[in-house]
Design a protein with these regions (language model features):
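Extended, charge-biased low-complexity segments
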Residues: 1-57, 62
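Amphipathic protein-protein interaction modules
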Residues: 53-126
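Short acidic DE-rich linear segments
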Residues: 124-135
Length: 135
């Protein structure tokens, strides 16, 4: 019996890695900034996002285009993960700022190593009750 990964998921993965500009902003905006925070500390447990796979996102260039098309959602999700008080967020967020604050990593293959159904959890509903997701 083989123990090698057997099933792939029809998604790709992107990870946003923080750049120094994000750390500088966080340390200045947070009323109680973590002492001695480094970029390595920030990257210890970041989110991984499943995005469309084959036929939509086939390579790094496609992944960057896809993320940049949805940059506002990624930006707000990340900011909220650090500071829930939106008044502390940069008010004039732009794609240029997004590019200065984050590096995009891309993985084309997502392997499912668990022999059980994938369960999803809706973390937020829109005001009208409809799903507030990109899919």
């Amino acid at each position: 019996m083989s123990t090698a990964p057997r099933y792939t998921i029809n998604r790709s993965i992107v990870i946003l890695r923080y750049k120094q500009a994000f750390l500088d902003w966080l340390m200045s905006a947070d009323p109680n900034p973590p002492q001695d925070m480094t970029l390595d500390d920030l990257g210890d447990d970041g989110d991984a996002f499943m995005i469309p796979g084959e036929n939509v996102v086939d390579n790094m260039q496609d992944a960057v285009k896809w993320v940049e098309k949805h940059w506002g959602m990624f930006f707000e999700h990340t900011l909220e993960g650090w500071l829930v008080d939106e008044s502390l967020w940069p008010q004039k967020r732009t794609l240029k700022m997004f590019r200065e604050w984050f590096t995009i990593e891309y993985r084309s293959m997502v392997w499912d190593l668990v022999n059980a159904p994938i369960l999803t959890e809706d973390w937020e509903e829109s005001e009208d009750g409809a799903e507030d997701t990109l899919h």
